[in-house]
Every structure is written in C-alpha cells, then in structure tokens.
C-alpha cells in the first residue's frame, strides 16, 4: 500500500546515517562507531556490539553483505517480501528484536531516555528535541523508561501496519 511504502521510505532515510542518499558500508561504520563512542563501550563489549550491528545490517538491510542499497531497491525488497511472504511480520519482528537487543547495552530489557537518544544519534538523528518527543510518545513509566517490548512493537507496527487510521508512534516521531 502507498501508506506502507511511505513509512518504508522514512525508515530508509533513517538508516542513511551519513545522509548521502544511499545505504552502504559507510552507514554501518558510522552507526557502529557513534553508538560505541556514545555509550563509551570499550574492549570486548565494543567489539561484540559492532559484530552484532554488522550482522543486523547484513541480515535485514543489505541482504547481500557489503552491498549498497538505494531507496528504490530497499522499498522493492520490502514490498516483494511483504506481498509474497506471510512470514514478513515474523521477519520484521526478528529484525527489531535483534537491533534493540544490541541497543539495550545494559540488558535491563528497558530503554531509558539516554539510551534512546544515543540510539537515534548513532543513526544520524542529532535533533534531540525530536528524539525526546519520540520518547515521550512511547509513554515512559515513572522511572522514565519504556519496556524494550514496547519500543520493538512500535517499530514492528511502523514497518508492517497498513492501517493509516491507527496511531503510529514512530511515523509521528519522524514527522515531528
């Protein structure tokens, strides 16, 4: 659907970390380095996160490791997968479970505001006021954290839900 395609294009732009119009290994490197630097990860922890992020990019974004992917290719890949394969939802669930498991560096199964800001910054989204708005849309609890499952489910809905009448927290965040 046009609505879903519009959201996939937003997702593509969010992955184009260096904002050059193409997703390539440079985007992977920049996101991994920013993420480990922001979290001040060193040694084995840094290496582990970088390996896990590389695996995520290769499995769910490039499909062919080390390749470049245009917005058109990205949208076509998702569209083809969505149309032919009822396992699309399961694939996207695995996709977001994997990346948010990496992002949840302290493994407490929740995301606090700083983790959220760092994750967005690692993907080239430096506008902190927009990121704070996005976090607020997820309705943090009294400890100012959001369950990891809530964040993952919001992203899954963003890339799989065709119903434009439903509130889409991630789409709203990117458009704010």
UniProtKB/Swiss-Prot annotation:
InterPro entries: EF-hand-dom_pair, EF_Hand_1_Ca_BS, EF_hand_dom
Residues carrying N-acetylthreonine: 1
Keyword set includes Transmembrane helix: no
Residues the entry annotates as binding Ca(2+) 1: 16, 18, 20, 27
Start and end residues of each EF-hand domain: 3-38, 55-90, 91-126, 127-160
Entry binding sites for Ca(2+): 104, 106, 108, 110, 115
Record key words, sorted: Acetylation, Calcium, Metal-binding, Muscle protein, Repeat
More details: The sarcoplasmic calcium-binding proteins are abundant in the muscle of arthropods, mollusks, annelids, and protochordates. This protein has only two functional calcium-binding sites; potential sites II and IV have lost affinity for calcium.
Job description of the protein: Like parvalbumins, SCPs seem to be more abundant in fast contracting muscles, but no functional relationship can be established from this distribution.
Name of protein: Sarcoplasmic calcium-binding protein
Origin organism lineage: Eukaryota, Metazoa, Spiralia, Lophotrochozoa, Mollusca
